[in-house]
A protein has these predicted regions:
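Membrane-embedded segments
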Residues: 1-48, 52, 59
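Stable alpha-helical elements in mature extracytoplasmic
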Residues: 9-12, 41-44, 69-72, 127, ...
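Short, internal strand/loop/helix patches
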Residues: 46-94
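Sec-exported extracytoplasmic/periplasmic mature domains
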Residues: 18-22, 50-57, 74-78, 105, ...
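Solvent-exposed coil/turn segments that connect beta secondary-structure elements
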Residues: 1, 33-38, 54, 65-67, ...
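Thiol-/selenol-based redox modules, centered on thioredoxin-like
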Residues: 86-152
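Conserved long hydrophobic alpha-helices within structured protein cores
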Residues: 8-12, 70-75, 96-107
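Envelope-exposed proteins and targeting segments
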Residues: 26-31, 57, 93-96, 102
């Protein structure tokens, strides 16, 4: 999820994209979903992509109806989002990143202590490094591996 005022996650995703590119993973994509579609028009998103110098060859910015976005975020990804006048942009949202595989499953991974990670904190560079490893691992393994699989 993305709120255009939240640049830390975007900068970390730029780094993630750069690191994953070194492995030449064919089906890797980043999807950023605007949680403020009333303000984040297609033109605003295009300007944001340009101003942040984002490589949009495999990074897509999505928007839609507020109700549908909030339902997808809350029910599909199990992340928080909502309106809050005291939050930047009047919207609160999770800064977490999830991995969704080619079959539509939300994938878990392991942290350095071998604890299961359900989401990755988009504001932490240490989680970006974990994401790179998980994405590389998923690109090299069979769909039926020994990790937890949760249908989104």
């Amino acid at each position: 999820m993305i709120l255009l005022q939240a640049t830390t996650t975007t900068l970390n995703l730029i780094e993630l994209q750069s690191r994953v590119a070194k492995f030449d993973i064919k089906n890797f994509k980043i999807l950023s979903i605007s949680v403020d579609p009333e303000n984040d028009t297609q033109e605003v998103l295009r300007n944001y992509i340009s101003s942040m110098d984002i490589d949009s060859s495999n990074w897509h910015f999505l928007t839609g109806a507020v109700d549908e976005i909030y339902d997808l975020v809350q029910s599909g990804f199990k992340l928080s989002v909502g309106k809050d006048s005291s939050s930047p942009g009047g919207v609160y949202h999770s800064s977490n990143i999830t991995i969704v595989d080619s079959k539509g499953y939300i994938r878990t991974g392991l942290d350095k202590k071998k604890n299961v990670k359900y989401v990755y904190d988009g504001t932490l560079f240490s989680d970006v490094k974990l994401l790179v490893g998980e994405i590389q691992r998923l690109s090299n393994t069979n769909f039926k591996d020994n990790y937890e699989i949760y249908k989104k």
